[in-house]
Design a protein with these regions (language model features):
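Generic cytosolic/nucleocytoplasmic N-terminal low-complexity/intrinsically disordered segments
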Residues: 1, 52-55, 75, 123, ...
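Bacterial Sec-dependent N-terminal signal peptides
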Residues: 1-25
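General helical structural elements
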Residues: 6-7, 28-31, 142
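Generic detector of short, well-ordered, non-transmembrane alpha-helical segments enriched
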Residues: 15-16, 37, 151
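Extended carbohydrate-recognition surfaces in non-catalytic/accessory domains of CAZymes
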Residues: 21-111
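Accessory beta-strand-rich segments of carbohydrate-active enzymes
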Residues: 44-48, 88-157
Length: 157
């Protein structure tokens, strides 16, 4: 009896694994995968160099290295709450994209591999979820109810 129970348990587990393997994940990158293949997004920095106007910026990147904001590397501000001279600008990003029509009715997720500090994401003008607070680690938003098929414009900001 014990062997039969073990066999049936293994059989059920195997069937579950086979069923899971039939699910196909499709990807559409909205950014590049590194400095060799950046994708141009609309960008505005709220302070520092080249601020207050929309421009193009490669994503992924560091905006200071592309001439925006306040370059502040090497400043001695550790251990202070908010010392004088530390930049407090924000970067605003926008990107329009289309999704394949065959994705309609499927789960759509925006996956971020990393973002420095606080990140609020909107898709077509609606918040994708709660604000990401942290550093360079992966976070994901399910935006299935925020994308509209049949229109060409999808905006992530």
């Amino acid at each position: 009896m014990k062997r039969a129970t073990t066999f049936l348990s293994l059989l059920a587990l195997s069937a579950g694994l086979l069923a899971q393997s039939s699910v196909k994940t499709e990807r559409q990158y909205l950014s590049g995968r590194g400095c060799d293949d950046m994708v141009q997004w609309d960008f505005m920095c709220t302070g520092g160099n080249n601020s207050g106007k929309w421009a193009k910026i490669g994503v992924p990147s560091c905006w200071e290295l592309q001439g925006f904001g306040t370059y502040q590397y090497g400043m001695k501000f550790y251990g202070k709450a908010f010392p004088e001279g530390v930049a407090d600008e924000q970067g605003l990003y926008k990107y329009e994209f289309e999704l394949p029509a065959e994705w309609n009715g499927k789960q759509i997720e925006l996956v971020f591999e990393g973002s420095m500090t606080d990140t609020q994401v909107k898709i077509n003008g609606r918040k994708a979820g709660s604000m990401h607070q942290g550093a360079f680690y992966r976070f994901i938003y399910n935006v299935s109810d925020r994308v509209f098929f049949g229109s060409k414009k999808k905006e992530c900001s």
